[in-house]
Amino acid sequence: IKSPFLPTRFCSSLQTNDLFSTVFKFMTEAIHPVLLHSCCAPCSSAILEWLTQNGYAPTVFYFNPNIFPAQEYLTRKNECQQYCRKLGIPFVDGDYDHALWREAVKGLEHEPERGLRCRACFGVRMLATAKCAQRLDIESFTTTLAGSRWKRLDQIREAAEEAVRLTPGTRYWDMNWRKGGLQHRRGELLAQEGFYNQLWCGCEFSMGHLTMRAPEDLPSYVRDFVKQLGSAKNKDETLP
């Protein structure tokens, strides 16, 4: 199955011996290797802690072409990468192509949060994660998305299981990462590590509530967009 969303830069980077040797080292030294799709450092922190304390060897895969704008994407990715480096956990950097992601959700722009647009978004990200797991020869993958109270677990599960059907040799670890005190621990690690705490889910379609915030409370690189968004909402227009 070919997909325009498969991270080509990531695929070429996997040819490097350094990455393979690092992942192989983790896989052979631990009981259970697992690929963790990560949306950000805060959502990954408690999950990574739990995994490493319970006999798992996580490799983090960062593939989130939904995040808007590019500066926000880089902020989240760089922080996640730095945190993995601090913990000594392998980090795989997927491609960022927001324009292609927009094609995947075309026609769903006005869907509410937790609606069909989110399901399509999960499909893109879970397929790329399954392909990454297959290439790294890691059977099981899971995602930090299943730790968010703002996401529907049934949509995530459906997207992941579809990805498994398209990617032989992989298995989705259907774990509810909200349970077991992990939500509380996430908050503790957020404060302890001084993580950047984002104000919106990721894509531009999840930014509507930001129009109610004072401009000075927003990152400088989204203020103009949020202003345009507020004007578009007042006129019932499509997002810029």
Question: Each predicted region: which residue ranges?
Answer:
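Glycine-rich phosphate/adenosyl-contacting loop at the front of the ribokinase-like
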Residues: 8
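Nucleotide-activated chemistry modules centered on ATP-dependent adenylation/adenylyltransferase
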Residues: 28-240
